[in-house]
Amino acid sequence: IRCFITPRVSSQACPDGHVCYTKTWCDNFCGINGKRVDLGCAATCPTVKPGVDIKCCSTDNCNPFPTRKRP
């Protein structure tokens, strides 16, 4: 499987059986910059803390950098 990986947001090969993930959360600058984003791959879908959103998927390049809605 190929997943997008931060910080360069480049597509990279991940080991067999891994899943891609997109993790987003707010920090002190969320109102200005939008949510922080972490893209990667892991053996299983990571467990996250409250306030952190995660989406996992298992097809090539299924975790592109999310687009920010403009007001």
Swiss-Prot record:
Keywords: Acetylcholine receptor inhibiting toxin, Disulfide bond, Ion channel impairing toxin, Neurotoxin, Postsynaptic neurotoxin, Secreted, Toxin. It holds the Pfam family Toxin_cobra-type. PROSITE patterns: SNAKE_TOXIN. The keyword rRNA-binding does not apply. It is found in: Secreted. Its main location: secreted. It comes from the Eukaryota. Gene3D superfamilies: CD59. Disulfide bonds join 3-20, 14-41, 26-30, 45-56, 57-62. Expressed by the venom gland. GO terms for cellular component: extracellular region. The keyword Cell membrane does not apply. One of its GO terms (molecular function) is acetylcholine receptor inhibitor activity. Binds with high affinity to muscular (alpha-1/CHRNA1) and neuronal (alpha-7/CHRNA7) nicotinic acetylcholine receptor (nAChR) and hinders acetylcholine binding to the receptor, thereby impairing neuromuscular and neuronal transmission. Belongs to the three-finger toxin family. Long-chain subfamily. Type II alpha-neurotoxin sub-subfamily. This is Long neurotoxin 1. It comes from Naja annulata annulata.
